[in-house]
Each structure stands twice: as structure tokens, then as C-alpha cells.
């Protein structure tokens, strides 16, 4: 980021709002932007055109004491999105910093709908009283129309710092990321051919996901190539009992090491009786008398 990268726009090409004073607020408060007149919008609508913001400049000019502290947060929202997803870009800068904020849109909107962009500000961690007219905001918009929407190269938001006592280390800004997309396969009558190499095309009764490696597939006994490429692709169709390899080698080894002798109660009694009798006989034998010579 460079505070000198962005040059002031040519006012002749921009729609300018009034430079109005705004009261300090800890809650998001709207900054009024000047959009094309109703007649201009109607003309574009009759020509079946859509519109986008090429460039938006928000000028902030502070009017607070020299010892004022706090941060100003400015946000651009797209009201076509749900409330928790409408934020598109935001800036944070010191309350005493005169600054120009630059935003470049990345989407078109239909003139049949209300203009979706809203601009808000709020002040955080400040020692200035609420409802004090702490600054003036002015917006400049450059819009364009097109017969139909096209992909717009992304241009990041930036700033132009006007107060010499502040630098790029004192400000911050961000932009929303691209929305994530996950393809959801369509189930259809024919789901047999998968992973086919060739142009992106489908046959009657097929979906594109069914013809790619992402879609689920039925067995294709006629395709030896698929069997070679994906030899285990249909194992999920087997029952869990067939896929269960059984107990591990360590468990089997422990079981083999354990004694596996079974005896009836009569056999156990006979074994004990015999062992006791042997002990008695061995301990009660009379010792032979030694002969005297």
C-alpha cells in the first residue's frame, strides 16, 4: 500500500454528493451517496442495461481537537446479500487523519432493483462525545452501464492519506473474499460412464457430474479401462461383514498364548484326590533300619 498511488479522480466524470457534517456515533450510521438521477436510471433500464460502480471515493475531513483519540470505521455493504454477509469492504483509520478511501466494484446490478450499495461509518474507542459533529464526508461515484454483465477483474480497495502525521502503518482496510462453491452432482437415469476424457458434453439422460470422476457411478462391466484405473471404486457396495478383515494379528497371538484346557467337575475331583494320595504315600513311607555291623 502506498499513500501516493491513488490520484484524485476527475470530478467531471463523477457524481458528487454534498460534503456534509456527520455526528459521532458508536453504531453504524449511513453516509448518503449521490447516485444517478431517476431519469438516467430509467433510460438505462429502458435500454435493458445493467450498472456497476467503476470507482467510489469517500473523502473524510476531520474537525476534532488535537488531543482527540479513537478510530473511524467505514464499511460498504451490498444489500442484495443477507445481513451477516452484506459487508464488501471496510477501512479503519485514526479520527484525526484526513483521508480518501477508494473502492472498486466487482459486480453488476440490475436497474429493476433498488441500488444495493450502502455506505456506513462508526467511531470506536474515542474520547469525543457522542453526537458531536466530528467530521465531514463526501462521496464521488463513477458508474457505467453494460448490455449484460461480464467478469470484472478484481481491484483492491486502497487509501490516500492526506495528514502528514499519519502513515500507512496507522490505517487498515480489507475486502471480502470470493464465495466458495461446491458442485452438487445431479442424480439421473444414466450414471454409468465416469472419468471420460473429451469435451465437456453430456448425452440424453446424463448429467455432467455423472460423466466425471466426481459423480457416483454404477458398475460398468464393459469398461476394462475403468477397472484398471479404479480397481477399488465399487468396494463401498459390499457389506461391512465382507470388508471386515477380522481381528488383528496381535489379538490372535494373545488368544493363542492363553491356556485352553477344559475339565469336568468329576475329572477335577479325581485329579485332586490322586495328587493328595501321592503326597500322603510319599511322606508316610517307613524308613529302612540301618544294619549294625
Swiss-Prot record:
Post-translational modification: Phosphorylated in yeast.
GO biological process: transport of virus in host, cell to cell
Keywords: DNA-binding, Host cell membrane, Host endoplasmic reticulum, Host membrane, Host microsome, Membrane, Phosphoprotein, Transport, Viral movement protein
Gene Ontology cellular-component terms listed: host cell endoplasmic reticulum membrane; host cell plasma membrane; membrane
Residues in coiled coil: none
Location of Phosphothreonine modifications: 221
Record bears the keyword Glycosyltransferase: no
Spans through the membrane: none
Keyword Transport: yes
Phosphoserine: modified positions: 223, 250
One family name in Pfam for this protein: Gemini_BL1
Any GO MF annotation of the entry: DNA binding
Membrane topology: Peripheral membrane protein
Domain of life of the source: Viruses
Localization, UniProt: Host cell membrane; Host microsome membrane; Host endoplasmic reticulum membrane
Subunit structure: Binds to dimeric supercoiled plasmid DNA.
Physiological role: Transports viral genome to neighboring plant cells directly through plasmosdesmata, without any budding. The movement protein allows efficient cell to cell propagation, by bypassing the host cell wall barrier. Begomovirus genome is shuttled out of nucleus by Nuclear shuttle protein (NSP) and the movement protein transports the DNA-NSP complex to cell plasmodesmata and facilitates further movement across the cell wall.
Similarity comment: Belongs to the begomovirus movement protein BC1 family.
Protein's name in the database: Movement protein BC1
Annotated source species: Abutilon mosaic virus (isolate West India)
Upper taxonomic lineage: Viruses, Monodnaviria, Shotokuvirae, Cressdnaviricota, Repensiviricetes
Amino acid at each position: 500500500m502506498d499513500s501516493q498511488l491513488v490520484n484524485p479522480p476527475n470530478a467531471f466524470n463523477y457524481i458528487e454528493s454534498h460534503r456534509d457534517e456527520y455526528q459521532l456515533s458508536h453504531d453504524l450510521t449511513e453516509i448518503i451517496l449521490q447516485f444517478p438521477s431517476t431519469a438516467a436510471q430509467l433510460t438505462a433500464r429502458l435500454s435493458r442495461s445493467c450498472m456497476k460502480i467503476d470507482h467510489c471515493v469517500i473523502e473524510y475531513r476531520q474537525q476534532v481537537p488535537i488531543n482527540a483519540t479513537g478510530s473511524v470505521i467505514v464499511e460498504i455493504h451490498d444489500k442484495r446479500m443477507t445481513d451477516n454477509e452484506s459487508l464488501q469492504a471496510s477501512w479503519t483509520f485514526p479520527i484525526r487523519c484526513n483521508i480518501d478511501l477508494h473502492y472498486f466494484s466487482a459486480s453488476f446490478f440490475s436497474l429493476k432493483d433498488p441500488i444495493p450499495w450502502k455506505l456506513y461509518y462508526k467511531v470506536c474507542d474515542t474520547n469525543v462525545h457522542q453526537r458531536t459533529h466530528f467530521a465531514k464526508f463526501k462521496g464521488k461515484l463513477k458508474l457505467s452501464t453494460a448490455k449484460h454483465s461480464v467478469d470484472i477483474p478484481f481491484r483492491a480497495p486502497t487509501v490516500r492519506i492526506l495528514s502528514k502525521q499519519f502513515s500507512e502503518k496507522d490505517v487498515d482496510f480489507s475486502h471480502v473474499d470470493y464465495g466458495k462453491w461446491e458442485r452438487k452432482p445431479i442424480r439421473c437415469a444414466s450414471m454409468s460412464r465416469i472419468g471420460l476424457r473429451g469435451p465437456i458434453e453430456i448425452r440424453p439422460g446424463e448429467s455432467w457430474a455423472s460423466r466425471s470422476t466426481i459423480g457416483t457411478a454404477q458398475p460398468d462391466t464393459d469398461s476394462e479401462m475403468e477397472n484398471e484405473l479404479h480397481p477399488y471404486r465399487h468396494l463401498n457396495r459390499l457389506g461391512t461383514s465382507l470388508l471386515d478383515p477380522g481381528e488383528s494379528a496381535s489379538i490372535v497371538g494373545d488368544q493363542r498364548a492363553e491356556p485352553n484346557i477344559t475339565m469336568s467337575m468329576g475329572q477335577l475331583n479325581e485329579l485332586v484326590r490322586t495328587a493328595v494320595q501321592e503326597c500322603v504315600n510319599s511322606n508316610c513311607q517307613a524308613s529302612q533300619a540301618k544294619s549294625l555291623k
